[in-house]
Amino acid sequence: MEYRKLGSSYYIRMDKGDEIVATIRDVCRREDIASATFSGIGGCQDAEIQVFRPELGEFETERIEGLLELVSLTGNLIQKDDGELSHHVHALFAYQCDGEPRIAAGHLKSTTVLYTAEIELRPVEGGVIGASLNLDTNTYFWGFRD
């Protein structure tokens, strides 16, 4: 992984074997970024994608493997009261299964880079977006701080 700050954004190039969410979180820790948004594209070798099932109160996870084109990645990182980062990431992958084109999309739990990923990380300027625990989903939503 290599990254540069240009203007107010960070541009991150990831390499084979990098886990995208963990790498973004690592850059935020290194650069003392408390809240940010990001987007990106790339090629991955596996992914765990989730969809929230409100009737069950839990996430359903699907794992896909192979040559996965990361068509779109978007998300944010926010800071919980204990200082830890909480992430919310969605992804869209295109791939082939038995020679047929497929897409998979949803909440991204994890994905590993196959050849590269290119991410733009945009720190929030002028404050911090905190995290508030939503009891219905047991996940963190934006919690604005005064």
Residue ranges and their predicted role:
Residues 1-41, 45-87, 92-146:
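N-terminal intrinsically disordered, cationic/polar leader segments
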